[in-house]
Amino acid sequence: MGYDFKVKLTGERERVEDLFEYEGCKVGRGTYGHVYKAKRKDGKDDRDYALKQIEGTGISMSACREIALLRELKHPNVISLQKVFLSHADRKVWLLFDYAEHDLWHIIKFHRASKANKKPLQLPRGMVKSLLYQILDGIHYLHANWVLHRDLKPANILVMGEGPERGRVKIADMGFARLSNSPLKPLADLDPVVVTFWYRAPELLLGARHYTKAIDIWAIGCIFAELLTSEPIFHCRQEDIKTSNPYHHDQLDRIFNVMGFPADKDWEDIKKMPEHSTLMKDFRRNTYTNCSLIKYMEKHKVKPDSKAFHLLQKLLTMDPIRRITSEQAMQDPYFLEEPLPTSDVFAGCQIPYPKREFLTEEEPEDKADKKNQQQQQGNNHTNGAGHTGNPDNSHAQGPPLKKVRVVPPTATSSGLIMTSDYQRSNPHAAYQNPGPSTSLPQSSMGYSSTSQQPPQYSHQTHRY
């Protein structure tokens, strides 16, 4: 390569510092690098972006796989990778994503903390339904293209703030995503342990090697239950989180304490699970005779004859073969009764959740949140938006007012071109137009905790 050509190439290469203003707008940091809230310097648009600087120099093969996959995924409910920058001078890699102001981890935490008040703020029924429908829509797109997400949890479900996509769900963190149409090896051989413990399907905990899209459906069921109750349904103490052994006694015990021990007729293939002998040695069926999902949800005031409960049962079916698919779930009667799902999960109402705050260069990570993050997942992952977030370990903490973060980035995914255009499979549950937004304007660059506090929800109208 000639010198003149190198000079010309360097001059033509886009530099992230020339295109975006992000100094002093750091919203996250971790072992993966740093994340900034950014705006274009040329003013071509007024959008907010998430700009992630990957730690270290150059780009790893795992990051290449993730980027290759992200560049092929195009769906309204999947986070969008806008651009990749490579700084020639210091060999730093920058990823540009859509910026999401909120995520389910902090939304649920906000409502959970309100339970200490005399008038707790429950997630409105319409908002829960819209969130679930959009999650299913995004996952159906991934599954239709043979992509398993493999790490669904509230921290990886982003929600857009004020702007053109207000209230739209974005599934993020494709770090563990894998193509499943024709793997050369069992997926369990590629990654022995996937999915954060609380959202891990029972077949994974029992060592399944050829797991399927059903693992994502189980995780969605866990998220749905958490939206309905503001509590993680299968919360348990985290131990030995770095082990490569998928079997986890405490997590299985928590599942059985909620669901009951699976009957042979309800999960015939459980005997084929690699860890079945360990399961039968460690557990006694009669210990969980009085445990059932009905009893658990009734404690949280979810009626067993409601359509919401019936759908939850289908999502949390123990046998992965009998577990409902994303397409079937989108066609469930739950989505056909009022209130219908909307494209803006806030349904045009004022958003009550605090915005993210900026971090100073010297500001340490919040110790409590950092401890929770380490307990929940042992290491950091990459989410699509490049934000940092906390798994839902500390389910008794108050609402996030300081150092709010969404999920950290890693990269361990396979990337191949998607094979088919995606069509919405459920015309009967199309989003409803919520009408003009009645929310108050918010600063486009604000991360302060001075966002207006919400009025009490009206439990009749389910509005803020």
UniProtKB/Swiss-Prot annotation:
Keywords: Activator, ATP-binding, Kinase, Nucleotide-binding, Nucleus, Repressor, Serine/threonine-protein kinase, Transcription, Transcription regulation, Transferase. This is Cyclin-dependent kinase 8. Belongs to the protein kinase superfamily. CMGC Ser/Thr protein kinase family. CDC2/CDKX subfamily. One of its GO terms (molecular function) is RNA polymerase II CTD heptapeptide repeat kinase activity. Residues 410-426, 434-446 have a biased composition (Polar residues). The active site is at 151 (proton acceptor). Component of the Mediator complex. Interacts with ccnc. It is an enzyme of class 2 (transferase). InterPro entries: CDK, Kinase-like_dom_sf, Prot_kinase_dom, Protein_kinase_ATP_BS, Ser/Thr_kinase_AS. It comes from Danio rerio. Its cofactor is Mg(2+). CDD domains: STKc_CDK8 (cd07868). Residues 373-390, 447-464 have a biased composition (Low complexity). It catalyses: L-seryl-[protein] + ATP = O-phospho-L-seryl-[protein] + ADP + H(+); L-threonyl-[protein] + ATP = O-phospho-L-threonyl-[protein] + ADP + H(+); [DNA-directed RNA polymerase] + ATP = phospho-[DNA-directed RNA polymerase] + ADP + H(+). Residues 360-464 are annotated as: Disordered. Its main location: nucleus. PROSITE patterns: PROTEIN_KINASE_ATP (PS00107), PROTEIN_KINASE_DOM (PS50011), PROTEIN_KINASE_ST (PS00108). SMART domains: S_TKc (SM00220). One of its GO terms (cellular component) is nucleus. Component of the Mediator complex, a coactivator involved in regulated gene transcription of nearly all RNA polymerase II-dependent genes. Mediator functions as a bridge to convey information from gene-specific regulatory proteins to the basal RNA polymerase II transcription machinery. Mediator is recruited to promoters by direct interactions with regulatory proteins and serves as a scaffold for the assembly of a functional pre-initiation complex with RNA polymerase II and the general transcription factors. Residues 1-15 are annotated as: Interaction with CCNC. Its EC number is 2.7.11.22, 2.7.11.23. Residues 21-335 form the Protein kinase domain. It is found in: Nucleus. ATP binds at residues 27-35, 52.
